[in-house]
Amino acid sequence: AYAAKVRLDQIGSNDTTDTLTNGVSSRRNQLLMDISSELGVASVDGAAEATLDKLAQIVNKAAPNYKPVGAVLSEALRDRLRSLFGAAGVKQQYIRDRVANVWQLGEGWVASVLAALLLDTREGSSSRGGDLAKLPTAAVQNKPEADKLIDAAVEVVAQLKGVAVALPSAGGAA
């Protein structure tokens, strides 16, 4: 979604690296190199022609110990979080703590919220139509604004997963 300049909800299980790059071989080749770099493997055999469903299986075999985020996405994420949260002095650990401790959600949610902050705060148009952003794109200036953006990202992830979430009450659990 990041390299192809599309929203996650615009990618289908039958998409391939070719359809995501509109058949432009240089973009496809770059995407394949980025996938390999992200996973920390020399190459991902069969990735070029695989549907995303099949690619997920290939990736799980090629890099069974992969944990989000790898070399490629960590750089993009670091840059985006700096531009969104830098003025508020909020670092990635603060976001992790808010999702894990305040929302009381697991590590998978943390990774998904970070991905939403990367993907859903991009300005501009999707290559498949519509806006890229589902969340505000402007930098936050303080921690209350940061909390509001993080909370909105949690809600976007919940919507994508098709589940309801709510901030736990002071004495309760999620």
Task: Describe each PLM feature range.
Residues 1-174:
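4′-phosphopantetheine-dependent carrier domains
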